Amino acid sequence: MFHNCRMEGSCNAETTSHVTAVVRAPIFCNCFALCLEIPILWDDLLYRHEKLLFGGFTCNGGAELILNSHCCLADAQMWQVHCHCSDSLSLQCLSATQVLKEFLEEFVMGGFVNKKYLWYREFVNSSRPDEINYVGSIMFRNIHYIYFRLSFFSTVHQACMLAIQRCISPELGVVFKSTYNYWLVLKCKSCSLQNYCALKSCAFWVRSIIDRVLREVEKIPVVLHRTTSKAEERRQTALKQAMMYGRCRHIQNLCLVNLNAFLHF
């Protein structure tokens, strides 16, 4: 299927799981709330001792949004992570819980870039189709992780995924299926110092990568409208108003879920 997917860690209906950690993330992570999840590239992010402790029981689903009747973009949201070990009361699972929670608290703080540099999303998604949509970023352990949600019609979905993968080397990024969506995550090391000029260069670099991806996908052929969609404009406006002015918009009214991923097509 996808050569650089971490399929061994994917969630599915036959996999047992239990909630092992819950964290409250600041509102700058709420761009991911629109997708109901923050995928976590465990193999890339974990230190060796962390992998030994809980790396084998995690999945690409990462942190899932805990939905409630008042999920507002202007409020900090609760996120949960599942463990896929066979015994939630085992010594390894219990000892990993606190380490995992501390890891998650550090990880979500890397989303500050989404509020500090609101222009980044607007620039990267400008005149780009919703099928490859920049969602948000996480700065973590000196690497900038750049998240794109992938959404294509089911008739061409597999061909599009393979076309995208042909453009993305393991050093450049990864393409994979999470719980609710398909994702492309690019990795940039040049803007790890959180410098404006470096981040601006990163944004131009990202657009060039996505241009290359779009050209490859259009060979299938697939018709992609290279315009900023009205839906994306609404998401940008809602996020800006929530982060800058505290205006509440219900997440459920703006959320994005890829039915292909959710139904495991």
Curated annotation (Swiss-Prot):
Compartments, record wording: Host nucleus; Host cytoplasm
Keyword RNA-binding attributed: no
Keyword Transferase (UniProt): no
InterPro entries, per the entry: Adenovirus_E4_30/34
Annotated S-S bridges: none
Organism, as annotated: Canine adenovirus serotype 1 (strain RI261)
Domain of life where this protein originates: Viruses
The protein's assembly and partners: Interacts with E1B-55k.
Task performed by this protein: Plays a major role to prevent cellular inhibition of viral genome replication by nuclear bodies. Assembles an SCF-like E3 ubiquitin ligase complex based on the cellular proteins ELOB, ELOC, CUL5 and RBX1, in cooperation with viral E1B-55K. This viral RING-type ligase ubiquitinates cellular substrates prior to proteasomal degradation: p53/TP53, LIG4, MRE11-RAD50-NBS1 (MRN) complex, ITGA3, DAXX and BLM.
Protein name: Early E4 31 kDa protein
